[in-house]
Design a protein with these regions (language model features):
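The conserved beta1-alpha1 loop
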Residues: 36-40, 236
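Catalytic histidine-centered segment of alpha/beta-hydrolase-like enzymes
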Residues: 266-275
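Conserved hydrolase catalytic core segment
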Residues: 100-139
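Active-site loop/oxyanion-hole signature of alpha/beta-hydrolase fold enzymes
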Residues: 13, 21-27, 49-56, 62-105
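Alpha/beta-hydrolase fold catalytic core
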Residues: 1-35, 57-59, 99-100, 276, ...
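Active-site glycine-rich loops that stabilize anionic/oxyanionic intermediates
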Residues: 40-43, 108
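Conserved serine/cysteine hydrolase catalytic core
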Residues: 190-253
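Conserved alpha/beta-hydrolase catalytic His-Asp/Glu region
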Residues: 156-210
């Protein structure tokens, strides 16, 4: 099957070549607002492959890979591996594409970026999907992520890689079988030049976590206020160690336009390919021109 997206690049303000997948949609679908999909800390554009294909049936979908991930350049200065810099990179892409109103799907770190972008320029987002993240994240989940990111593990075969993921993240996906772990491995890893299978990101993205104060969970309640009244779908894994039920309740109070869907027996983060989640996302977009 031919690819339904184009590999494109833009240049960051500090000269990095950054990659994004452009799904043009039917006939360019100019009449409908585009969708911007932003991935999590260690992820890349492949995370949204199935969702982007589905959404591109009716509208354009843009899936950037943040610096240090996938086909995007690695940064020479690891201090630039921060949500503020990622937001600046994405804002430059949006400006170059002439996009001033859009829908956002943000997973984990991508959701944090969504709130920062909303706070900096309110009123641009027609609808938002937040995947297992909120203005306040649990310290337990942050500690778990800090413990595995940047470890530089490698594997001799895809099956070994899948089993490695199952060992590390089995608590978040207790019902996954080997095929599903293989699928996750192929979304998050690549074959390196020496033939070993490695994670598809710069291990240096972990360095900012090691600096004093940087590992503290962010508090973005003020930024979240910029999304008050914006139609929102909050997806939460029932087993999530990053997004608590209490935070979900507070988010609903602050944004009455938010609907929540909880994915049973899944932790951080749902794939967004779950049938109920996919249906909810499509329903949200049905209300957006």
């Amino acid at each position: 099957m031919a690819a339904t997206y184009e590999d494109r690049y833009w240049t960051s303000s500090d000269g990095l070549d950054l990659h994004y997948r452009n799904y043009p949609g039917p006939d360019g679908s100019p009449a409908k607002l585009p969708v911007l999909c932003m991935h999590g800390l260690t992820r890349n554009a492949r995370d949204f492959a199935a969702l982007a294909e589905a959404l591109a049936a009716t509208r354009r979908v843009i899936v950037p890979e943040m610096r240090g991930r996938g086909l995007s350049d690695y940064a020479p200065d690891s201090d630039s591996y921060s949500p503020v810099t990622y937001v600046a990179d994405v804002e430059k892409l949006l400006a170059e594409q002439g996009i001033d109103r859009f829908v956002v799907v943000g997973t984990s770190m991508g959701g944090l970026m969504t709130m920062l972008m909303a706070a900096s320029k309110p009123g641009r987002m027609a609808a938002v999907v937040m995947n297992d993240v909120g203005p306040e994240v649990d310290a337990e989940g942050v500690a778990r992520i800090s413990g595995y990111v940047g470890q530089g593990r490698s594997y001799p075969t895809w099956v070994h890689a899948a089993r490695g993921l199952a060992e590390a993240h089995g608590a978040a996906f207790p019902d996954f079988d080997l095929d599903q772990w293989l699928e996750m491995a192929k979304r998050t890893m690549v074959v390196s030049q020496n033939g070993r299978i490695v994670f598809d990101y710069d291990m240096a993205i972990a360095e900012p976590f090691a600096k004093p104060g940087n590992a503290a969970p962010p508090n973005l309640w003020l930024a979240f206020e910029a999304l008050r009244g914006v139609p929102m779908l909050l997806v939460r894994g029932a087993l999530s160690d990053l997004l608590s039920e209490d935070t979900v309740k507070q988010m609903g109070v602050r944004n009455p336009a938010m609907r929540t869907i909880t994915v049973p027996r899944v932790g951080h983060a749902p794939t967004l390919d779950e049938p109920d989640v996919r249906a909810a996302i499509l329903a949200l977009l049905d209300g957006v021109e």
